[in-house]
Amino acid sequence: MVLKVRVPEDMFGGDVEEGFGPVADAFRANFASGAEIGAACAVYQDGAKVVDLWGGYRDGRTSRPWEEDTMVTVFSTTKGVASIALAVAHSRGLLDYDERVATYWPEFAQSGKGEVTVRQLLSHQAGLPVIDIPLKLEDLASLDRMAEVLALQAPVWDPGARHGYHGITLGWYEGELIRRVDPAGRSLGQFFADEVAAPLGLEFHIGLPDDVPAERLATIHGYKPPEMLFHLGEMPRKFVTGFLNPRSITYKAFGNPRVLGLINNYNRRELLRLEIPAANGTGRVRDIASAYGELATGGRRLGITSVTLDALANSAVPPSGGLMDVVLRLESIFSLGYVKPFPSFRFGSSAGLAYGTPGAGGSFAFADPDTGVGFAYAMNRSGFHLWDDPREVRLRSALYESVLDAGSQRPDASR
């Protein structure tokens, strides 16, 4: 069972700008309800930090406090942060979203992938959510070995016809694509560190350096997969049955190596030091919000062009076979490394320009060009929603409905 502890009322830090008090109230309410152990939330608007909150325990078993510089692993919220590296590469003319992946990575054309475009790959349409060759952790440490394995993989559906969440594999494909187009041949983690984190002054890592002290890391309090069966009111039933069925695409998408499919394993340093750009990004929550805030306000410090930013904000190009996600087993919409708003998951303003990615357990971060907002929330007590964790929705609703009056954050009840 997921750990539950009582957090004292005085275990909070940070501040908000005038007018953003409802977000602070929502943050405290999450703790008062007993839903949190430790968490942080930050918001940038028009380039300025307007919300920066943290509280509770970074480790619920030892009662060590979550502090201003605490870092937390954000699971698939990593995907959106990692995809900023692809946006930088696109702006520099290193890749074209509508070019074939094999143009940059010839070996990728093996096994029927020759016509897959970068857009299809980044939008979870390439049919590559699984890896058939059994992997070990040591394989993940070798970028050359992973490139060979990824190039050999055959799609499990006709690319472009369907889509399905590439829960783990997306980041590895992005990583090899960056290695191929970057003149310096850097890994995605290093490219991100040099070209995104450094210019913005971020403490966020895709591949945690060994010199980051353990005392700065939040401990994830997760659950074992069978526990999902007790939360079918929160987690979609079809997803749960697929995740627990070794024959299903859903199981295979998160099960190679199996260590990556268990939330608590992301407390292991040997896993965090690897580059898993779809899953193991670790950093300060305010820095995630800062990065998205940069995208929401023009991307000047990263040299991101208006053409790239328009591509990210524009409506997704859906697969020809509809929006049913083969892996998640419900409708979803992806575009260029991000999730876009859709009736079952409405975020950002009613203009629909926002883009971001949620992570296992409840984290979520996004950019909203319409309001100039970069938003991020992460926690260490795992919840059971694929998205719209009630704790995160409470914060986002306080921001968009109470402060900005910019649109409902609740799903369309008719869907």
PLM segments and residue spans:
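Active-site-proximal loop and beta-strand segments within enzyme catalytic domains
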Residues: 5-6, 60-169, 176, 259-261
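Short, conserved catalytic-motif segment at the N-terminal edge
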Residues: 13-74, 96-99, 152
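Alpha-helical scaffold elements that line and support the substrate/ligand-binding pocket
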Residues: 43, 47-48, 73-95, 121, ...
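A short acidic/small-residue loop/turn micro-motif
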Residues: 57-59, 381-384
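Active-site helix/loop module of the DD-peptidase/beta-lactamase fold
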Residues: 68, 76-77, 91-133, 151-152, ...
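Active-site-proximal alpha-helical segments within enzyme catalytic domains
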Residues: 124, 169-177, 275, 279-301, ...
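Active-site Gly/Thr loop motif
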Residues: 222-285, 314-370, 406-410, 414-415
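Short, gly/Ser/Thr-rich active-site loops of penicillin-recognizing serine hydrolases
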Residues: 276, 297-300, 308, 313-324, ...
